[in-house]
Structure formats: C-alpha cells, structure tokens
Amino acid sequence: MYTGVEIDIVVADALKAYTTYQEIFTTELIEKTDFPKGQNEVVFTIYGTRIHLLDENPEAGMQAPKDTIVPIWLNVMVPDIKETFKLAIDHGWKELMPLTDMSDFGVINAVVADTFGYQWMLHQIHKEVSFEERKAMFEQQMDD
C-alpha cells in the first residue's frame, strides 16, 4: 500500500510535455504509455516529487488549460537556477518574474510559464534562513 501525494496535470500532449520537462529538470521516469493522443499518461518524479501527466481528453472530463495560466504553480528547488531558467526560456517558456536574488532570505527565485499553461517557480536556496528569521524580516518590511 502506498501513501503520499501525486500532482496530476492535464496537458494537451503528455508525451511532449514530459520530453520538455525532462530536458529542463532532473526527472526519473516511472511509467509512460505510447497510445494515440488523448489516451497517454506519464508518471515521473522531479527531485522526488511524483507528477502524473495526462493527455487532455474532454470525453473523460480532462481539460488542459487554454489561453490562460492556471493560478497555481509548482515550486521546484533546483541546484542551479540560472541554468534551469535558461533551459526553460530556451524551450519557449515565458518569464513571469525574472531571476530575483533575495539574499537576506537565502534564495534566488524566478517564475516561468510553460507552453502547456502551468506556472513554475524556480527556487535555489543558497543559505539556510530559519522561519523565525524570515518572519522577523517580513515584519520589519511591513513596519517600514
């Protein structure tokens, strides 16, 4: 018996989406079908998080995003944000937030939108900052 969380994502073409994601992130393939478009699925992990891509199939009630970006993002902590960001842009992803160095918080962030309608926050931690320290910094910013 398995327990855990799996993120299921409906896209226009699961096989194409997986090819793109594996070229940008470190992935581990679990299973992948090779059926006619509309019937495929790919299960894989990105840094240990299980993701399940499914082809859009309106007859089965599975709709991929259309012309709008879904208001949820996947936050991926990567070892080299500049390289990952460049790969995403090179694959036609749209920059929503540029590389932003938040050195006081110990991170560099960026947000990109993939060509399938989903947002990805890229996140590189370069210094461990405790919750208490981050909270105090936010409170100080709110007081200023």
How should these model regions be labeled?
Residues 17-21, 88, 117:
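Conserved active-site tyrosine of GNAT-family acetyltransferases
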